[in-house]
């Protein structure tokens, strides 16, 4: 660093308080017109990976989903046995031949002694000994599902029916309560059979969308974002040091011991000088660092230099006399030993002396 007065006269180094001077560096292009501190690199992190990868469904799950999603009219129920109560609609196991659903009969035709209707497939043998079912008109509309009576929830201890119109206690879907084409002439009670078991109404289970649990919303898929990497690596700032140059003249120097560039090409370093001391800095007498913004006192660019890859690197250049002078003053610099270290020369001398002594003997 060279300090001049307003009259362009050099200021003596001993008259400058260099305790709070600081220089920062950044990387620029060879012409000094474009900043090169960041470089764009492709990265594997740009590829989107779903947080929960879809798992392959098992064979039983696929078979059950295929059977349950097959075309069946609403209101049908499976008949796997003759007397036990049927399970819930969402837990009904599929039959072995996949045709275990039958249309619901009207209440007039159902009597306690009437058996369950067998399978609708007429080609299969009569396993249970029941007569063949009557022909079914599949073009006819199916009756709407019959809901349980609301009065059954407010029955008193004496057995009387106590109607209630309070919809808040027992919320029911309005679409199920009054479906289209459904009248209020339906009988409130369900048919009972000889065993005394009351069967719940038939509800149509909504079809499950395929891979609904593994579907990933489109809004959560991030776009391919650019990944930037810092090109100039190392200590990007240095404090001022009062040292002697190779001619034994004092001066103020800023040393950057280990700077490296990750990209090939020709670059320059931009250096900016600032003072981080509290007033009266930069005049002598400052005792602490300020917490405000530091103005740029000076700025300059280095000479262009070439960065090589590991394969094209021509080799480490010779150490300059100025670097040797700084190293002799205790500065830690990556210096290259041109003639080898003293220990290697010592080993070489010792091996040579031992060889001469053996020849003399």
UniProtKB/Swiss-Prot annotation:
**Subcellular location, in the record's words?**
Nucleus; Cytoplasm
Every copy of the Velvet domain together lies at 1-336
Asked whether the keyword Coiled coil is assigned, the reply is: no
Q: Name one GO biological process term.
A: sporulation resulting in formation of a cellular spore
Which cysteines pair up through disulfides? They are none
Q: Where is the composition biased (Pro residues)?
A: 130-147
Q: Which UniProt keywords apply?
A: Cytoplasm, Nucleus, Sporulation, Transcription, Transcription regulation
UniProt feature, compositional bias: Polar residues: 108-127, 149-168, 181-196, 212-222
- Ranges annotated as biased composition (Low complexity): 57-74, 93-107
What cellular component terms from Gene Ontology apply here? cytoplasm; nucleus
What triggers its expression?
Answer: Expression is down-regulated during fruiting body formation.
Composition bias, Basic residues:
335-349
Q: Which InterPro entries match?
A: Velvet, Velvet_dom, Velvet_dom_sf
Q: Give the region (Disordered) as residue ranges.
A: 42-222, 327-361
The record describes its quaternary structure and partners as: Component of the heterotrimeric velvet complex composed of laeA, veA and velB; VeA acting as a bridging protein between laeA and velB. Forms a heterodimeric complex with vosA; the formation of the velB-vosA complex is light-dependent.
UniProt lists the family membership as follows:
Belongs to the velvet family. VelB subfamily.
Function per UniProt: Component of the velvet transcription factor complex that controls sexual/asexual developmental ratio in response to light, promoting sexual development in the darkness while stimulating asexual sporulation under illumination. The velvet complex acts as a global regulator for secondary metabolite gene expression. Component of the velB-VosA heterodimeric complex that plays a dual role in activating genes associated with spore maturation and repressing certain development-associated genes.
Q: What is this protein called?
A: Velvet complex subunit B
* Organism from which the protein derives: Coprinopsis cinerea (strain Okayama-7 / 130 / ATCC MYA-4618 / FGSC 9003) (Inky cap fungus)
